[in-house]
């Protein structure tokens, strides 16, 4: 633990007033606070132990252990562990702070990739914890200094409202429209059985063995027409379609349900509660940081509202090249219209937020095309916190739409906090395998759902694992993973009376309202466009991805948080990866994709400069930046060219992914795909997949409308199966 404390205190050290000049009390307090003074190392250790499930986690353990010895410190730190005084070579924690800073900075660009991984991982988690941890009042000592207000009073808990107006409001008005459709398996067994039976589900409780439960001897058996594993944009839509068609549907969700009244909108808590692995997910080489939802509503609960229809050139490609007739059909176009209408998708906004104003102005100055982004939220929804859940319920994710249809039909229920362990199927010799249901775990207890059809919609990162552990052998399961890799650049706009308005903050306003789709001509590719948009970055994620060159520089960068605009370039990647297990995501950026991302980064830097940023930079570990106002046009051009030409595969920059797809792709032959054009698996009848994993290739834009449209069509296919097979 000494080594971890020393590393955290090096990343975030105490800096006295003399080192920062004249500042007000809140800024002075922020600079003087170290990681250990705020309890950061203990929380970092807990996160690493409980949330970080990475195949190379051993590097952290080994590195921290080595640093606890003088010889290990010599191995990892080299001559910098030499002090010139007996005992000459010292453990990392006994070295002067300045020397420790030099060591960490050396790791960030080390020839050895394991040292770069060690630096990147501990830096990201330390920063994330320091800037997201809160006291009993829900505040963080750094927030005022960096200009972050946290959740506004409008987003506060409903305790007062519940106490004063509980007689005036119905429970679903306070807790959300899924209030009556959630089954809490922590409730008494009799209450669970009563709720299931009340919705028409046959329940049997014939457990024989008192020592534990198993698939052959479960705690409970539940019978239904269809069981859906996953409640996101795929599973939620499929479940809603089936329930409205009159079939009994049970939804199994590994994440928990957070009603509107339970949403804190605190970044750290929301990530821990509603993101896969608490937001601590990355490819096997840690080169790509991955964000994915894990809660009722899935990614639609925490995404950024963009609701873009499948591009015409992608539909044409999937229909002609992949020979999937669905994407050239009227049915698919109707499906897109249906899901957009159900989500209330519209393109307008009453007021545009800081980041999007910057993107729009920069594009207009450069003559680049820029347009409004369709969103599943009303035009007056000026909220930058929807990545942490929508407290007002205005963002129309599946928990506000398709899952509501499920609940209101009286044909469906949702079981949150349940981990599907196996898809069950009949396996009679000489006959085709037929799905018969799903086994799932709630804590240590095993339950079984017996169904006529089974739909797996765990998302592109989890569906392959469930299918593989259920015995499916198709070689395409877990392959062809696309990530829509993203690279970002930043621009600092001081608080001045001139544009952009002084009152606006980087974390406020609609997360996505403007976008630019630009063909990267330099790649000579007809594959698609580079999409340029803005992200949602609250202090934790912001601090996790910005460069670190010293503790003082890092804290100074964070002072600019509220007026630093970020813009990213999203790539429709040609290269693909594989998923071998829950934790092993192998993805190597290919050369062509890397060049496209570099070109995208160049364009983003130019947009920020054109928009009027005083300072611009990227997330490269060197931490270079340029004062645009004092630089000549030649200096700006040279800086943009140099920063955008740096390699992206060596862990020196930062690549992110919020969209994962293609890992069980749809096709017309089992040799090249995992599921049929109907969504049914090649190996098991009545087993369907309905999430982004069925995408034939990368999409190139935000995938919510596309996956919902595909799930809608697959849902109709399942209805046909249920009609035929009574």
From Swiss-Prot:
Q: Which UniProt keywords apply?
A: FAD, Flavoprotein, Membrane, Oxidoreductase, Transmembrane, Transmembrane helix
* Database matches in InterPro entries: FAD/NAD-bd_sf, GMC_OxRdtase_N, GMC_OxRtase_C, Long_Oxdase
Family statement drawn from the similarity comment of this UniProt entry: Belongs to the GMC oxidoreductase family.
Q: What is the lineage of its organism?
A: Eukaryota, Viridiplantae, Streptophyta, Embryophyta, Tracheophyta
Transmembrane segments in this chain: where? Answer: 103-119
Enzyme Commission number(s) from the entry:
1.1.3.20
**Protein name, per record:** Long-chain-alcohol oxidase FAO4A
Where is the protein situated, by its record's location annotation? Membrane
Q: Does the keyword Amino-acid biosynthesis apply?
A: no
Instruction: Report the active site residues.
Output: 659
Source organism of the structure: Arabidopsis thaliana
Enumerate the residues binding FAD.
224-239
């Amino acid at each position: 633990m000494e080594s971890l404390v020393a590393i955290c205190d090096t990343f975030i050290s105490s800096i006295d007033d003399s080192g920062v000049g004249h500042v007000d009390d809140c800024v002075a307090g922020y600079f003087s606070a170290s990681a250990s003074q705020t309890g950061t190392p203990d929380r970092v250790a807990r996160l690493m132990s409980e949330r970080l499930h990475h195949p190379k986690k051993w590097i952290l353990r080994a590195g921290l252990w080595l640093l606890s010895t003088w010889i290990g410190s010599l191995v990892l730190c080299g001559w910098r562990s030499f002090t010139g005084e007996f005992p000459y070579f010292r453990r990392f924690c006994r070295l002067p702070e300045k020397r420790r800073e030099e060591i960490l900075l050396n790791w960030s660009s080390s020839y050895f990739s394991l040292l770069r991984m060690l630096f990147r991982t501990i830096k990201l988690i330390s920063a994330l914890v320091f800037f997201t941890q809160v006291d009993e009042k829900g505040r963080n000592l750094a927030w005022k200094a960096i200009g972050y207000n946290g959740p506004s009073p409008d987003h506060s808990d409903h305790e007062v409202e519940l106490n004063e107006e509980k007689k005036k409001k119905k429970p679903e008005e306070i807790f959300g429209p899924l209030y009556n459709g959630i089954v809490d398996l922590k409730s008494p067994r009799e209450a669970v059985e009563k709720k299931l039976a009340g919705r028409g589900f046959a329940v049997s409780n014939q457990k024989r063995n008192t020592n534990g439960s198993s698939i052959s001897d479960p705690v409970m058996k539940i019978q239904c027409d269809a069981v859906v594993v996953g409640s996101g944009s795929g599973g939620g839509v499929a479940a809603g379609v089936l329930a409205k068609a009159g079939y009994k549907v049970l939804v199994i969700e590994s994440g928990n349900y957070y009603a509107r009244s339970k949403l804190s909108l605190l970044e750290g808590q929301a990530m821990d509660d509603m993101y896969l692995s608490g937001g601590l997910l990355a490819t096997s080489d840690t080169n790509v940081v991955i964000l994915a939802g894990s809660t009722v509503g899935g990614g639609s609960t925490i995404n950024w509202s963009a609701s873009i229809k499948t591009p015409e050139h992608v539909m044409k490609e999937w229909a002609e090249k992949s020979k999937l007739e669905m994407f050239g059909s009227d049915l698919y176009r109707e499906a897109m219209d249906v899901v957009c209408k159900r989500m209330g998708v519209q393109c307008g906004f009453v007021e545009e937020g800081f980041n999007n104003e910057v993107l729009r102005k920069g594009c207009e100055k450069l003559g680049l095309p820029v347009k409004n982004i369709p969103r599943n939220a009303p035009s007056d929804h000026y909220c930058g916190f929807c990545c942490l859940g929508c407290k007002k319920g205005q963002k129309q994710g599946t928990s506000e739409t398709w899952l509501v249809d499920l609940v209101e039909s009286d044909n469906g229920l949702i079981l949150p906090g349940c981990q599907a362990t196996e898809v069950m199927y009949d396996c009679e010799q000489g006959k085709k395998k037929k799905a018969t249901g799903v086994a799932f775990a709630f804590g240590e207890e095993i339950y079984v759902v017996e169904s006529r059809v089974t739909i797996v919609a765990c998302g592109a990162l989890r569906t392959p694992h469930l299918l593989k552990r259920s015995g499916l052998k198709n070689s395409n399961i877990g392959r062809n993973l696309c990530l829509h890799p993203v690279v970002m650049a930043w621009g600092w706009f001081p608080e001045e009376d001139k544009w952009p308005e002084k009152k606006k903050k980087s974390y406020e306003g609609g997360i996505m309202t403007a976008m630019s789709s630009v063909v990267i001509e330099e790649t000579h590719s007809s594959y698609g466009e580079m999409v340029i948009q803005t992200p949602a970055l609250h202090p934790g994620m912001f601090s996790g991805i910005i460069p670190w060159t010293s503790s003082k520089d890092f804290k100074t960068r964070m002072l600019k948080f509220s007026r630093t605009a970020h813009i990213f370039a999203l790539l429709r990647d040609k290269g693909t990866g594989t998923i071998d297990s829950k934790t092993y995501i192998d993805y190597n950026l290919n050369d062509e994709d890397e060049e496209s991302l570099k070109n995208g980064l160049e364009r983003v830097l130019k947009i920020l400069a054109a928009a009027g940023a005083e300072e611009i930079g990227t997330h490269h570990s060197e931490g270079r930046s340029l004062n645009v106002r004092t630089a000549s046009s030649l200096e700006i051009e040279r800086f943009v060219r140099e920063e955008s030409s740096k390699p992206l595969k060596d862990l020196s920059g930062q690549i992110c992914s919020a969209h994962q797809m293609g890992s069980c792709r749809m096709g017309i032959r089992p040799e090249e795909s995992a599921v049929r054009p109907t969504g049914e698996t090649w190996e098991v009848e009545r087993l369907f997949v309905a999430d982004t994993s069925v995408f034939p290739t990368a999409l190139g834009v935000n995938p919510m409308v596309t996956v919902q449209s595909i799930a809608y069509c697959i849902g109709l296919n399942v209805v046909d199966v249920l009609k035929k097979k009574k």
